[in-house]
């Protein structure tokens, strides 16, 4: 597949998601990194976003809760180029009813090559990267080229 580049601005659009058993870890991580997160545009699935806002006072654009379609909403935003990175603390020890949605979200994040952190260590590495604080580019699929090929 052909690729092109997408610019990520200095102020990133960050999606925050956590399974129930991981919500407190994500809230604590957001509290610890509040100063670093504040200048960015933050999105979250419903319950997670409300809890983060209550505990940190960070401004959050809340979507639906994951099981009610929030993971799917995030996937759509990623495909539209409206999310720059995903912080998703998921619980590998417990299945959730919306596992297919979670898998679809991870797949679409990979297709569109956005940085994904699935645990505290990776999230710490991601936000300590120089690219987090500056404008950068990521390579993404060239959808127009893909469509042109498919329509031949």
From Swiss-Prot:
This is Methylglyoxal synthase. It is an enzyme of class 4 (lyase). GO terms for molecular function: methylglyoxal synthase activity. The lineage of its organism: Bacteria, Pseudomonadati, Pseudomonadota, Gammaproteobacteria, Pasteurellales. The keyword Lyase applies. HAMAP family: Methylglyoxal_synth. Its EC number is 4.2.3.3. Catalyzes the formation of methylglyoxal from dihydroxyacetone phosphate. Transmembrane segments: none annotated. Residues 6-152 form the MGS-like domain.
